[in-house]
Amino acid sequence: MKNNLRYGIRKHKLGAASVFLGTMIVVGMGQDKEAAASEQKTTTVEENGNSATDNKTSETQTTATNVNHIEETQSYNATVTEQPSNATQVTTEEAPKAVQAPQTAQPANIETVKEEVVKEEAKPQVKETTQSQDNSGDQRQVDLTPKKATQNQVAETQVEVAQPRTASESKPRVTRSADVAEAKEASNAKVETGTDVTSKVTVEIGSIEGHNNTNKVEPHAGQRAVLKYKLKFENGLHQGDYFDFTLSNNVNTHGVSTARKVPEIKNGSVVMATGEVLEGGKIRYTFTNDIEDKVDVTAELEINLFIDPKTVQTNGNQTITSTLNEEQTSKELDVKYKDGIGNYYANLNGSIETFNKANNRFSHVAFIKPNNGKTTSVTVTGTLMKGSNQNGNQPKVRIFEYLGNNEDIAKSVYANTTDTSKFKEVTSNMSGNLNLQNNGSYSLNIENLDKTYVVHYDGEYLNGTDEVDFRTQMVGHPEQLYKYYYDRGYTLTWDNGLVLYSNKANGNGKNGPIIQNNKFEYKEDTIKETLTGQYDKNLVTTVEEEYDSSTLDIDYHTAIDGGGGYVDGYIETIEETDSSAIDIDYHTAVDSEAGHVGGYTESSEESNPIDFEESTHENSKHHADVVEYEEDTNPGGGQVTTESNLVEFDEESTKGIVTGAVSDHTTVEDTKEYTTESNLIELVDELPEEHGQAQGPVEEITENNHHISHSGLGTENGHGNYDVIEEIEENSHVDIKSELGYEGGQNSGNQSFEEDTEEDKPKYEQGGNIVDIDFDSVPQIHGQNKGNQSFEEDTEKDKPKYEHGGNIIDIDFDSVPHIHGFNKHTEIIEEDTNKDKPSYQFGGHNSVDFEEDTLPKVSGQNEGQQTIEEDTTPPIVPPTPPTPEVPSEPETPTPPTPEVPSEPETPTPPTPEVPSEPETPTPPTPEVPAEPGKPVPPAKEEPKKPSKPVEQGKVVTPVIEINEKVKAVAPTKKPQSKKSELPETGGEESTNKGMLFGGLFSILGLALLRRNKKNHKA
């Protein structure tokens, strides 16, 4: 009996163990199969363009691609441009070495193809893989629909194809992994080529305007023409469709800039079409995928047109044309170049030839021409007055002798030095007289100026400079009959500067097809910025350059005409950067008689129109030249559209005076000086008067808690509301002067006055600067006073110090009011000026000063004792919402005393508790800079804090544990993706054997269990 029992128990254990073991084997094999599938195809899509694709194959298993995962992440058709390329790099995992292969090779052994797109700027990139096809200059679209593999994979090979792309395209880089079958089926992918839709474009408005809507253009004064189009398109536009228009050969869109760009057509921040400059003056705009399903599409273009100095070399009328869909827009303009500067003996003229902002280089051409007589001992110098790189390289200077007639010299200062029939290079002959400097300057000595010379300069300027001003100067001595006059020389100076213009283009459309009662419109307001300006400088050059997704930085200076026979001054530059800022200046109005805030004025600058006038060297005695350089393809004096809608202005300083009328019609000046570094703000406020009879003692208590503030008596007119004025400045000093109102009447009781002088006041330390503020604190007393008059002076001792980054500020308040009236009882005016207050120490960067006028307005006769107390600690309002921002401050968990957490339940702290507990506001003090506009951080934070300080640590502890878990889990994912080299992982044969083995174990266990039951029954 016992043996059977033991046998039954042993069988039961064996059966249960078999079932459990078999189940674990089956489950383990299933997970192993899933791991094999993951190792076989792992695709990651990263924002920075780096993708990891691991493939593992076997001889018998057929796999499918995971392209659908990419499509679920971001669905679109990628438009690529394939160009001939001889750089096709092939790499294999077995032997990681570069192998050159032709791009058009058969894809039989190709397993994975990566297409890398070369772009000017790094942008978020999504990756896909397309098959390498025949080279073609046309655009094509690759459909990303997943393909299933039907053949076994072979030895893994990875082909990386680097294909260049035009600068105007901004397409994502796509990488995708596929097997041999997918590579073969990719040849059947849908390929679409854009259609020329120029015939579907209607020119509603087309015009060409000269400078400031005139018929004249002076290229050397930085002037240009503007082409304006208002276009309407037929419905049915698709991605890749394009339209063209052609300009006449006497103008171009770049000026002296080496970049050849035109603006994108945008609907707000959405790019609807990209532009490019083709040969023969043709401009092409290609629509993006945002044009799909759009109807009623319109576009507005404003493109700068610069006079081509090569084509138009003389003064006179020029007809400028633009042709779009066989409709020609034309304008006849009077082109006038400047003659340079000269005298009886010689003439000097120059112009900036090219400007390459990408390489910080520019080229300049100067003509030195003799007029009458002979000039000896001539020295010609070229100097970068603005934008010089002191540690740069020497410029490249070449000297040419002009062989033609002086009358045939191009008025546009254009020199085709490759034409040997007109220009002969003599640089080697004058090498001993030519001196070059590392700062970009040169000096050339000519013994006798009897021929016309051309000096071609090629140099660099300082990267990041906002001004480029190149000066050419000639000093000569005319040959005299008598040596007595030899010392009488002359100087000619010619400056060349730069001004940057911008183009503008925008468009819009509605989603279609239009459904009844569907009012959804595809419209986004395009922000327009008007740029106009005045240049008093003789020589201005315009440059155009566009940077994708950039904002405008505008640095402007007013040029000044100088004397001494030449023009000097600043050059105006408008250029694009990626940084931007908004400056907001605001003024707070003074309290009016009724006790309310008279007004609040706030002026902010963000994408608002910016106006300044342009007028280059008009009415100047001497002339300077201007070369065109354009940036961001928007017309100066026209409009600019930016994506971030932020405009930054650099100015030296700004001063403003704000005046306003108070109740007694006196004028108060609110003088504010704004500087970039110190941010000093001075505020002078005068409060209105008080009238009435106060028969009881009037007591004023000012509690400064954790804010630096002071208050004065408000107007007593029977109103019980509060008037609060807050002045909050970050990183600034605030000087505040206040005058309290007065009370008129006779005083019958004893009068007691206390004066707190500077010795007694708390010191506020800020930034290493000591500011002492003195106020008139002795009251003026009028009326009949029957009691004794006593005055007490409290010196500046035992006062706390407030530290703010190392600055000390002594503040004295005008705290004693003027008293007039019939007061039958003793009247005590008392101010608590931070005696024995705790010391507050901040980080040295942010300080907040509050000025509050929180006393109630009282009128009438008061029989009893009158006490007016001020509690600058705002009442605690539990439902105040914006608490999440407070814990972000690193100083929030620093309260040393547990008193603050123990008092959050008090709904309205009575005013007498404020003076009695001066140390209560100590902990919330560091939170003031985090919420400058909300002075109630303790009340907002406490309801969400635990009542015990010990529990705060418990709240933070789970966050630390979670981070540790994440770090522990992260490494487990990496070895999984790196195990793709295992050859047998994921094999069907090994998987089936394991599952069969586990199933047999399970069946055996069940049989044993059933047998065990039979034995028990027996």
From Swiss-Prot:
The modification Pentaglycyl murein peptidoglycan amidated threonine is found at T985. Residues 112-126, 827-838 have a biased composition (Basic and acidic residues). It is a peptidoglycan-anchor. D- repeats lie at residues 745-782, 783-820, 821-859, 860-878. It comes from Staphylococcus aureus (strain USA300). Residues 194-511 are annotated as: Fibrinogen/elastin/tropoelastin-binding. Residues 37-511 are annotated as: Ligand-binding A region. Promotes bacterial attachment to multiple substrates, such as fibronectin (Fn), fibrinogen (Fg), elastin peptides and tropoelastin. This confers to S.aureus the ability to invade endothelial cells. Promotes adherence to and aggregation of activated platelets. Residues 38-61, 78-195, 595-622, 740-813, 827-997 are annotated as: Disordered. WR repeats lie at residues 879-892, 893-906, 907-920, 921-934, 935-948. The keyword Oxidoreductase does not apply. The gene is fnbA. Residues 39-61, 78-92, 129-139 have a biased composition (Polar residues). One of its GO terms (biological process) is cell adhesion. GO terms for cellular component: extracellular region. Residues 545-604 are annotated as: 2 X approximate tandem repeats. This is Fibronectin-binding protein A.
